[in-house]
From Swiss-Prot:
Molecular function terms from GO: DNA binding
Gene: gtf2f2
Protein localization: Nucleus
Quaternary assembly: Heterodimer of an alpha and a beta subunit.
Alphabetized Gene3D superfamilies for the sequence: Winged helix-like DNA-binding domain superfamily/Winged helix DNA-binding domain
CDD domains according to UniProt: TFIIF_beta
The protein's name: General transcription factor IIF subunit 2
Tree of life domain: Eukaryota
Length: 264
């Protein structure tokens, strides 16, 4: 993420606005996102019980119905628990703040090319809490459905009564497999011959051309690649860079080119 600095609005700090930092269950946040109209999602209740503060949240009834679980449509009607008591926690000596930002020049990918016009400090966290579902039949049913959906295989096999020919026609074997099997069969036919015979074939080839790649030498000698490389290491040099990169040539002591004969 690339972000450019903008103005910092500290009105929230000046007003000493207290904020609550509350951890929500994932399903509850998803239900909140479905709120329409004024965006009212429920009611927050704060009471004093024997000098102790008790906080609970009640979800609106119209948001309690779950249409999908884990990104998949729910197979049956499932309702979330509506009652959620808060577990209050201390801030623990930390100074936590809530910031908001307004962006411009933002691309479709929100993680890139972010330009922050304005950064505002809305307030300071004075309470931390965890919003937990109350134990109920709805909650147990929802968790049971989540477990059932997560245990279903992502892909299922299905037996077709007739062949699908709209896109691909069935074949006994694919061309790639045919070529691979042919190559494998040809390689198996390459039986090792005497080393001196291979050397004769190699010297004869290098009299015609100075450089060869390994594929051409395999075609010429009809020898397995590993066996051929063992022999080439004795008489040849493998070029790893330059104009003739990835090719073999004879070592100087084995060369008998016409140009060298004239220079001698």
């Amino acid at each position: 993420m690339s972000a450019e600095k903008g103005e910092l609005d500290l009105n929230g700090a000046k007003q000493n606005t207290g904020m609550w930092l509350v951890k929500l269950p994932k399903y509850l946040a998803q239900q909140w996102a479905k709120a329409t109209g004024r965006g009212e999602v429920g009611k927050l209740r704060i009471v004093k019980n024997q000098g102790k503060t008790e906080v609970s949240f009640t979800l609106n009834e119209e948001l309690a119905s779950i249409q999908d679980i884990g990104g998949k449509p729910a197979s049956s009607l499932v309702s979330t628990p509506r009652e959620h008591p808060f577990l209050l926690q201390s801030v623990g000596g930390q100074t936590l703040t809530v910031l908001t930002e307004s962006l411009s020049g933002q691309s479709e990918d929100k993680s890139e090319n972010r330009v922050i016009d304005k950064l505002a400090l809305e307030g300071i966290v004075v309470h931390r809490a965890e919003c937990r579902p109350a134990a109920s039949d709805n909650y147990m049913q929802m968790k049971r459905k989540q477990i059932e959906e997560s245990s279903k295989p992502k892909r299922q096999s299905q037996q077709l009564e007739k062949a699908v020919t709209s896109n691909y026609k069935p074949v006994s074997n694919h061309q790639y497999n045919i070529e691979y099997e042919k190559k494998k069969k040809d390689d198996g036919k390459r039986a090792r011959v005497d080393k001196h015979q291979v050397l004769d074939m190699l010297f004869s080839a290098f009299e015609k051309h100075q450089y060869y790649n390994i594929k051409d030498l395999v075609d010429i000698t009809k020898q397995p690649v590993t066996y051929l490389k063992e022999i080439l290491r004795d008489i040849g040099i493998y070029n790893m860079k330059g104009t003739h990169k990835n090719t073999w040539e004879l070592k100087p002591e084995y060369r008998h080119y016409q140009g060298e004969d004239k220079s001698d």
